[in-house]
Regions:
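Phosphate/pyrophosphate- and phosphate-bearing ligand-binding catalytic cores of soluble enzymes
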Residues: 16-17, 23, 68, 154-276, ...
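A gly/ser-rich beta-alpha-beta helix-loop segment of oxidoreductase catalytic cores
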Residues: 108-149, 220, 224
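Short amphipathic alpha-helices in soluble, non-transmembrane regions
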Residues: 4-8, 48-52, 202-203, 274-278
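Glycine-rich beta-strand-to-loop/alpha-helix junction loops that act as flexible
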Residues: 62-66, 100, 263
Length: 298
């Protein structure tokens, strides 16, 4: 790792050692990253990834950390913070192009500023453009695949490619990037001309719903379980009497049963044990086998 650090320094790529990962995810859980790399532009990102491969160093690409549960022991290897990249948004007619590190909130506000409709559903989803494309994020009847047209990414072979959204196998909380280890660099979205007042009203309406129904006052990673076919995870959990159910510092939210929250001092082990208990009870009582939506990074 010393050789790796020397090369980062030579390339003027910022990094920290033993960086607490709890500070870089919305769950506020996780031990230290051996190295935490903070590329400031696309070139530095590509260089950092290439260096990891050259030195056979294990790495993980991190956006806003809004769908992540880091292990208590941390991450042995390199965590690359994509959210530190230049947050650039370009608008041309009805097309928005955004870097992977752009926050979804900023993307939605850019669309509003230019009177473009189609991203209202994403307002209030925590995270970055890269993370949202990676998992085909969605809410309130909309998904990224509805407006995504093309993606630029760094392929495993080291070359930058641009592919149409149709080739990304976009479906419920899934994209091809889960399998091909590509690093998303930027994405392009096609929107529709709209009335700014109507767009603003829709964004405000959906944000009000979030504030009313979701436990945004407590650390979490958003929806904990994927929606099973023909049902809703939160309803099944509530039906089984698990509202407020606890394990250590982790609990099923009293406000929304689809969320597991950190009540203070929760560990990764607490969250995983709670999820296992909830899954077992729901399976026994309803027959549904819940699948975790949050990503566990060890």
């Amino acid at each position: 790792m010393e050789r790796f650090k020397q090369k980062l320094q030579a390339a003027a790529i910022p990094f920290r050692e033993n960086e607490p990962l709890a500070a870089h995810c919305t769950f506020k859980i996780g031990g230290p990253a051996q190295l935490f790399v903070m590329p400031e532009n696309e070139q530095q990102l590509c260089s950092a990834v290439a260096l990891c491969k050259e030195q056979a160093v294990r790495y993980y690409l991190l956006g806003n950390g809004s769908n992540i549960l880091f292990a208590d022991e941390g991450f042995s290897g390199v965590v690359i913070d994509v959210s530190a990249l230049d947050a650039e948004i370009a608008v041309e007619d009805t097309v928005l192009t955004a870097g992977a590190g752009v926050r979804l909130a900023a993307l939605c506000k850019a669309a509003l500023k230019h009177g473009l409709s189609g991203l209202e559903f994403a307002y209030g989803i925590p995270g970055t453009v890269g993370g949202a494309v990676y998992m085909n994020a969605g809410a309130y009847g909309g998904e990224m695949k509805d407006v995504l047209t093309t993606v630029r990414y760094l392929a495993a072979e080291g070359e930058v490619r641009e592919v149409p959204a149709a080739e990304l196998d976009l479906r419920y909380r899934h994209s091809i990037f889960e399998e091909n280890s590509g690093c998303i660099l930027s994405a392009q979205f096609h929107l529709q001309p709209g009335n700014a007042a109507d767009i603003r009203a829709k964004m405000d309406e959906l944000m009000a719903k979030r504030l009313d129904k979701q436990p945004l006052d407590k650390p979490s990673a958003g929806s904990t379980f994927k929606r099973p076919a023909g049902a809703f995870a939160a309803a099944l959990i509530d039906q089984c009497g698990l509202r407020g159910y606890r394990h250590g510092g982790a609990a099923v939210s009293d406000k929304h049963c689809g969320f597991v929250v950190n009540l203070g001092g929760a560990t990764c082990a607490d969250v995983l044990a709670l999820c296992d208990e909830v899954r077992a009870i729901v399976k026994e009582k309803t027959g549904y086998d819940l699948e975790k939506e949050i990503r566990v990074v060890r």
